[in-house]
Amino acid sequence: MTGPLATGRAGTGDDVVGVEVTIDGMLVIADRLHLVDFPVTLGIRPNIPQEDLREIVWDQVARDLTAQGVLDHNGQPHPAVAAMVDTLSRADRTLEGRWWRRDVGGVMVRFVVCRKGERHVIAVRDGDMLVLQLVAPRVGLAGMVTAVLGTAEPANVEPLTGIASELGECTNAAQLTRYGLTPTTARLYTEIVTNPKSWVEIVASERHPGGTTTHTKAAAGVLDSAHGRLVSLPRQVGGELYGSFLPGTEQNLQRALDSLLELLPSGSWLDRADATARG
């Protein structure tokens, strides 16, 4: 993660807030905790079909995890690690992000922000490495996403709103001026969208009692360019999906995430009882 939330190694104390493991390491931890479901974006799934070979690999991985302090000498995960992995597997709400990075050779970084009860966890996958980070709720969703993406100057543009399908068909500045933009802003939008350094697509999901999950059909977005950061937010109006683009301030990123979460059955990041208690 590139933001202010530092990752740490698991140890013997009670202040463990982060851990870095391989995908094989995560599978071993999940097996110890009898967990099998994880956010699709992270791609955490069994990768060695041959049982005898898997046992050999997992034995070595378990030894490495024990040396790292992630597993104790009885083979059980550190309590803080177990809590983070449980949150990842059984989250009440999840934001799932795919981050395409032209600025570092076109790699895709996958990340999630998960909430289970009061506990919030960020997980980032880069290649075969996975970083889990426990984070305080007061950081806020925009702060948690920014912890992954890093900060950036917001693009100096006017807001742009339109029907999502129609905006998607715009390929030049002249078409964008139909939405009330000045020619200068329309050209700037065109330059940003056609030549991004990186872009992020974020969807949300909600876990229901009984274990079923609902995913949003639309996504929020973050786009970084030489001209600064843009955020995009989806909004359902009268059965029509609209998209809005705004300068990429943290406040506007929070607006985008709130708008995305409104598309879930609950309409929010918190359960109603939690929101009422906080209010």
UniProtKB/Swiss-Prot annotation:
GO cellular component: cytoplasm
Keyword presence, DNA repair: no
Database matches in InterPro entries: EspG
Compartment(s) of residence: Cytoplasm
Keyword Chaperone: yes
Keywords: Chaperone, Cytoplasm
Family designation: Belongs to the EspG family.
Subunit structure: Interacts specifically with ESX-1-dependent PE/PPE proteins.
Entry function: Specific chaperone for cognate PE/PPE proteins. Plays an important role in preventing aggregation of PE/PPE dimers.
Name the record gives this protein: ESX-1 secretion-associated protein EspG1
Species name: Mycobacterium marinum (strain ATCC BAA-535 / M)
Classification of source organism: Bacteria, Bacillati, Actinomycetota, Actinomycetes, Mycobacteriales
Gene field: espG1
